[in-house]
Amino acid sequence: STLDVVQFNHYNTQENLWHVALWFDFLRTLKEHPMWNTETATCWNGSTEITQSVKPEGFCRVNSWMPIALGGEANMYWLWRTHWAGHELMHGAVLDASGRPMHTAGEVKQIAADYEKAADFINGTRVKSEVAMHFTARNWRIMDTQHVVKSLNYMDTLNDSFYKPLIDCGVRPDVIDAKQPLDAYKLIVSPLMMTIQEGDLPARIMQWVKDGGTWIAG
């Protein structure tokens, strides 16, 4: 089957917004384009209850630019306008149910103007990296179902101990699945991999190393 579009939604807060970057760096590698962020929160979330509150000024701007800066091609606000009845009545939005702008509307308007100014650069460039970090669903499942290391949370450790240190060093990695091609990379980091038996990775990475690639595994 053909994958038509890669899309992502999140409701991270200012405290953990940086966690989302790993997902954008991963989703970007799945398909050349398009990759869309289809639920960008302007403020709080809310289904049957509100579990977040008003975000600080500037949060919406950062949250809106992240998917675009990291390779996305669309950024859609959820909600654009609050419901007049039914589910998620308390969800944050750009406009309220009557159509009046909510407190973040001015920030959204400025973001749209900034997108327009940067349109030629955004449309004319792609996010490329010579460094990759492996992340696979199989290894995630193994770590979650067979606790090889007591109390180790796979995603938190991957983010805090491997991904973030790369970012802090000024390295912008592609986050790749085991089946992804390796040719574009000079350095590949494969953390927390309980198995590499996916996508013929052992043979492919051995050849890649013989061809001059540097592999950090552990």
Language-model segments: what does each one mean?
Residues 4-218:
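Carbohydrate-binding surfaces of carbohydrate-active enzymes
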